[in-house]
Amino acid sequence: MIAAVEKDAVPRKRRVISQVSQACIRCRQKKIKCSGEKPSCQACSNNKVECIWPDRPNMRGKKPSSAARTLSPLTGIVQPYLGSHPFSPTILSPSSPNMDFTYSINSFGDYQKQLRLPTSRKLLQLWDIFLKTSYTELFGIFNKAQITSQIASDTAPPVLVLCICAHAARFSQEEVNRFKSSTAASDYYANQAFSLLPCRFQDISLTNITCLLLLCLIELGSCRGAKAWLLLGMALRMVDSLDLGNEINDNPLTMGSNTVSWTEAEQKRRVYWACFFVERLLSTGYMAPSKLRSLSLSLQKTSIQLPCPEPNFLFNQPILTELFDGSLPENTQSDTTSMAPYQRSLQLEFMTGSLIRLSNLWSEISRWALCGGYTKDITPPWLNQSQFHRSFELLKAWHENLPPRAVWSYTNYSAYSSPGESAGACYTFMHLLYHTTLTYLLRNVLDLFPEKSRQKSKLFSSVSQRFGQQPPTVWMDMILDQVITSADFITKLSKDPLNYIMSPFVGFSILTAATIHMLLKFCVVNIDQNYISSSRLVHVDHQILQDRSKYWKINQAMLVTLQRLYNFYRFQYLEEQSLYNFKIPGFPLCILEYGIVEDQSMKSNPDLNSFSKELFSRGTNELLNNGDDTQSGNSTPAMGVSEIRTDTILDEEVPVDPLITSILDDGRWWEEMFGSERKAGFKETVFEDMNGRSIRL
């Protein structure tokens, strides 16, 4: 047997794969071999693509002790910066736009942004404009003395300064001249504020909530309702996180060392009630988010006081105020007898609390009207058991319980509107909201498009058909007198030269009043000649809304609605044969909803019929007298106008742009507002209102 011979163990050669120390980004993504040639590897050269190389990492690194020595001096610098956010002026580059200063903001991490803001003197001017024109919905949220000193010393939070500038620049003539339009001036600062918000969302603070509310109002006025609701929802989520709906201290009047100061607690209350007011003000509309009202905004869960008077907040004078339901906090009821007379006398002498309570009434009434109003009630509205009567009594009770300084009088109005008094905006807006709510409620029982008749009861025909009986005459007269008085008040107050409020809600109030004035002009003036003066106010409504549409896009949409409704009233009630036949009177959504209008001005309707296209192609002079109320130069009715209704025609008419608001310009706008029912042959005759005459007040 042959023995096997053992061979020496020969080590196997190791297979060596040639690798490069670093591969380009494209080869690394495609997982292919990279030749490592620079500036372009072989694979990228063959594919004729750009070869991108990552930065070469530092292989050695630094010692831990060295890193600790480097970061230790910076610890004291980063901590205070997160709270104060100071901004300091730097050198303006020659290529930058013509602005006054450039501010460098070092935010979290390595994120850096360059912000260009005006000088402190210019910021103080914009701050003053903001207090006069835009300090309405958020009245009381700012400590004016603190914000003024921060702006003067360049220590104000930059994002808050940008939000204030975004509101004030819209009404500053200097900023409008610089940016060519009020919208561009506002968007310039608003966009910079939006760019700073993402890096601040991890910091839930009162400043961030305030900025979100300010930007929400800007988006609402710009006809971007969905974005406004998104910003408001984020602010309410921060309110829930901070639990602002509950008192921090056991006793709201104490200022112990273990609790926050009274001024800080009052500031948190004011931020909470500002969120409450904005949410209640914008809660009307079918598209309003139903689940946005968070738990902290529920009145059953709220246990904080209403805001105190403005002087107490500015001068840090603690005072006890009521809760929303009118009661005092439970932990202070036993101490009310020992309170100072000054504190007891001023418990009800505040205006912000009355405005907050009114906003809740507006929210409930608008939601009730949008859900059907009296048509969903089984009790006639003139009976005490009806929801309409209960809402009406709540409004009357609110008005009767106003403190003496908040009651409407020309003396109070002049005192609040004096220079340097910022409470005038709150005082004016409160009474404007009250009469808007009252008009909104009483209008629900009226027929805005009644049948042609000289009987006043025809204005309540829907109520009569709904409950099978005619309303009492006294009740109908009371409703008409109240709604006309409130509508006239809205128009006259909006036109008053002492009123500087530029809130977009004023435009909605004007539109609400204009619906009553158009009803008077075309349907009621023949019934009662006492309403002639009120019917003429529709031209004032048109002028006011036209002026405010220059600043807010949402008011532009309301102006178009007013013009279209005015055209319809003329064509419906001045013709022998009506253009449209109504079976069930109703309300168009455009006069009921506030806060959800989207910008559709740039959208065109591709379904324009050939008749409308032919009409647009014709010159304006060819249609000046076609379908006008009266022939120029005499008092005889124009063709197609009924002689019976000529006594309702005034010498001046609202000028209407036919390319925008003609009843024939868009075949779909009527379906969107009223429904699809119309007469078949209404387009056979051209009806245009293009007289072009100006408004004479």
UniProtKB/Swiss-Prot annotation:
GO CC terms in record: nuclear membrane; nucleus
UniProt keyword Plastid present: no
Signal peptide: none
GO process terms (BP): DNA-templated transcription; regulation of transcription by RNA polymerase II
Molecular function in Gene Ontology: DNA-binding transcription factor activity, RNA polymerase II-specific; RNA polymerase II cis-regulatory region sequence-specific DNA binding; zinc ion binding
Record-linked InterPro entries: TF_fung, Transcription_factor_dom_fun, Zn2-C6_fun-type_DNA-bd_sf, Zn2Cys6_DnaBD
Keyword Translocase among UniProt keywords: no
Lipid bilayer topology: Single-pass membrane protein
Transmembrane regions listed in the UniProt entry: 500-520
Domain of life of the organism encoding this protein: Eukaryota
Keywords: DNA-binding, Membrane, Metal-binding, Nucleus, Transcription, Transcription regulation, Transmembrane, Transmembrane helix, Zinc
Compartment(s) of residence: Nucleus membrane
Portion annotated as DNA-binding: 24-51
Name assigned to this protein: Uncharacterized transcriptional regulatory protein PB1A11.04c
Taxon lineage: Eukaryota, Fungi, Dikarya, Ascomycota, Taphrinomycotina
